From Swiss-Prot:
Protein name, as recorded: Neurotoxin 5
Function per UniProt: Binds to sodium channels (Nav) and inhibits the inactivation of the activated channels, thereby blocking neuronal transmission.
GO CC field: extracellular region
Organism field: Buthus occitanus tunetanus
Keyword annotations from UniProtKB, A to Z: Ion channel impairing toxin, Neurotoxin, Secreted, Toxin, Voltage-gated sodium channel impairing toxin
Superkingdom of this protein's organism: Eukaryota
Main localisation: secreted
Tissue expression: Expressed by the venom gland.
InterPro entries: LCN-type_CS_alpha_beta_dom, Scorpion_toxin-like_sf, Scorpion_toxinL/defensin
């Protein structure tokens, strides 16, 4: 669960950077 959370969080940050937006 913890690893999944980290992976999901990293993916969110990557998407944020890629799309040049961030909501969190």
């Amino acid at each position: 669960v913890r690893d999944a959370y980290i992976a999901q969080n990293y993916n969110c940050v990557y998407t944020c950077f890629k799309n040049d937006y961030c909501n969190d």
